[in-house]
Amino acid sequence: MHFLITNEVKKIFNDKLYSQRFKQITDLVSTKLNIDKKRFFECHFVDEKTIQEINKNYRNKDYITDVISFAFDDGEIITPLLGEMYICYQKVVDQASQFAHSFERELCFLFTHGLLHLLGYDHIKIEDEKIMFALQDEILNELKITRNINGARND
């Protein structure tokens, strides 16, 4: 499985670290969940205004959120394109501070969270939330992307 990054905020991703981390996450998820290597998805990094518009137009929720995913699979037709996710740069910055961990950890958490949504995971029901969040933690911990602010990059 591979991905295409679109950066509409021009504040991040000049550093190869994030692309490497995203590839590590994507490769690990592909292996764990046996995802066809030909599948791909798009990840867009956007500002607060853009994500609020997307949230309002497609989810009828008029507020800024951190990540939104649109899975293209409907269960019957499987296309190479899994879907698209949108991550709000400013929410990454704000939430890293709020939760007292690094920018890298928050960014990778939201990337993983959005990817799992593209693969059909959700957290509407408590039992589904436990499964999804346990898988997120397993992936991030295996890659040593932890909540320890001292050991991680904090941009």
Curated annotation (Swiss-Prot):
* Cofactor: how and how many bound: Binds 1 zinc ion.
Q: Name one GO cellular component term.
A: cytoplasm
Q: Which cofactors?
A: Zn(2+)
- Which Gene Ontology BP annotations are present? rRNA processing
The record's GO molecular-function terms, alphabetically, read: metalloendopeptidase activity; RNA endonuclease activity; zinc ion binding
Q: Where does Zn(2+) bind?
A: 113, 117, 123
Q: What class of enzyme is it?
A: hydrolase
Q: Which InterPro entries match?
A: MetalPrtase_cat_dom_sf_prd, YbeY, YbeY_CS
What protein family does this chain belong to? Answer: Belongs to the endoribonuclease YbeY family.
Under PANTHER family, the record lists: ENDORIBONUCLEASE YBEY, CHLOROPLASTIC
What is the recorded name of this protein? Endoribonuclease YbeY
Native source species:
Ureaplasma parvum serovar 3 (strain ATCC 700970)
Query: What is this protein's gene name?
Result: ybeY
